[in-house]
């Protein structure tokens, strides 16, 4: 009788939900970081995860303060896992804070930089489990290749094509890799010259200023590549203010799936757009769900880089805006990506393109 009571109590006992905190480096009103958080919330709902999101508003001290606040909580109130992006190489300061509190950590969106002296996951910082990076180099490469193809079609007899570039920053690993992809595409095209490259810290106003200077020095560029949509819009504003009388604006390519960027692509104001990487945090939750349920991702590599980017056209942009209106990603079944819930899965497949078919 006592055994039956014990078994019954175990059966009806509530399962303790995973508690995950996401330290979002971006601004709450930024379309990209808002979409990233919304996708994570949809994944958390599917997987029974309690998700806590805080925004650093692109301020490094706020990011560090948020980590310190989590670490200072009583042991029973701390999250099981913390996800953060290694923007501006902040991981070197975040890891000691969180690891010292015994909190498991995971880098998403931007992992360890090749020149960062933080060691490898699970070594110096033993609670740092790993990272998931979108293949940022792929995003830069795809958009620049598309620009080059369109520049050749627009001026087939030019012989030489000028490319300008506005990157995010020279420190954040994902920013560096996006620019690497842009440069690789330019190098492969023997008829393209990258005539100037600047940084605008992902900021629209700063990009507008930088682009204005670029257009003074290079009055008739064929193409302009920007590391994110906000900087692309800044470049568009700069051209509209200074250079409309010169004739055709440069073909502009960028990265991110904000409504404004997708609409600009559909209207032809953007020539090239890649995206899908905002899903990285949601997929990180899938990996951590599996880790918590006994299926460690380490067999696939602790630092994973996945080709999640897709190149959009007007049709796929329209489909995206229709299916995910209002950044509502609840129609995605995130449980299907879990190796715990789908034992036949041998590896993770997080490509974004199939979601629009």
Regions found by a protein language model. Give the residues of each.
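Hydrophobic alpha-helical segments within soluble ligand-binding/sensing domains
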Residues: 63, 130-160, 207, 257, ...
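Extracytoplasmic "Venus flytrap"
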Residues: 19-39, 43-44, 51-66, 84-89, ...
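Structural motif
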Residues: 52-79, 196-217
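Hinge/cleft segment of the Venus flytrap/periplasmic-binding protein
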Residues: 166-167, 283-357
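Short, solvent-exposed amphipathic alpha-helices that sit
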Residues: 31-47, 139-146, 173-192, 234-238
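Venus flytrap/periplasmic-binding-protein-like
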Residues: 104-117, 225-270, 279
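Periplasmic-binding protein-like
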Residues: 22-24, 75-86, 104-109, 164-165, ...
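Flexible loop/hinge segments that line or gate small-molecule binding clefts
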Residues: 97-138, 261-262
């Amino acid at each position: 009788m006592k055994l039956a009571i014990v078994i019954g109590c175990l059966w009806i006992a509530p399962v303790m939900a995973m508690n995950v905190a996401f330290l979002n480096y971006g601004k709450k009103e930024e379309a990209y970081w808002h979409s990233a958080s919304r996708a994570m919330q949809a994944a958390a709902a599917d997987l029974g995860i309690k998700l806590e999101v805080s925004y650093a508003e692109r301020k490094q001290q706020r990011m560090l303060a948020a980590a310190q606040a989590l670490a200072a909580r009583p042991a029973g109130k701390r999250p099981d896992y913390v996800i953060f992006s290694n923007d501006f190489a902040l991981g070197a300061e975040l890891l000691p804070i969180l690891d010292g509190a015994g909190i498991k950590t995971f880098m998403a969106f931007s992992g360890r930089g090749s020149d960062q002296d933080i060691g490898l996951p699970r070594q110096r910082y033993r609670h740092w489990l790993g990272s998931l990076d979108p293949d940022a180099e792929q995003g830069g490469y795809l958009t620049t290749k598309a620009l080059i193809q369109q520049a050749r079609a627009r001026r087939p007899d030019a012989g030489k094509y000028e490319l300008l570039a506005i990157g995010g920053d020279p420190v954040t690993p994902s920013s560096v890799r996006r620019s690497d992809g842009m440069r690789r595409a330019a190098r492969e095209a023997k008829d393209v010259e990258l005539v100037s490259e600047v940084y605008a810290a992902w900021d629209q106003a700063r990009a507008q200023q930088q682009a204005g200077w670029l257009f003074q020095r290079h009055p008739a560029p064929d193409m302009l590549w920007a590391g994110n949509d906000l900087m692309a819009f800044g470049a568009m504003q700069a051209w509209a203010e200074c250079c409309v009388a010169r004739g055709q604006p440069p073909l502009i390519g960028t990265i991110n799936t904000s409504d404004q960027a997708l609409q600009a692509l559909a209207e032809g104001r953007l020539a090239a757009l890649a995206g899908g990487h905002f899903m990285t945090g949601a997929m990180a939750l899938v990996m951590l769900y599996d880790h918590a349920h006994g299926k460690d991702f380490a067999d696939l590599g602790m630092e994973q880089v996945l080709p999640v980017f897709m190149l959009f056209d007007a049709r796929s942009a329209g489909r995206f805006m229709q299916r995910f209106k209002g950044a509502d990603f609840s129609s995605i079944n995130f449980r299907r990506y879990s190796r715990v819930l789908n034992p036949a899965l041998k590896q993770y497949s997080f490509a974004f393109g199939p979601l629009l078919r």
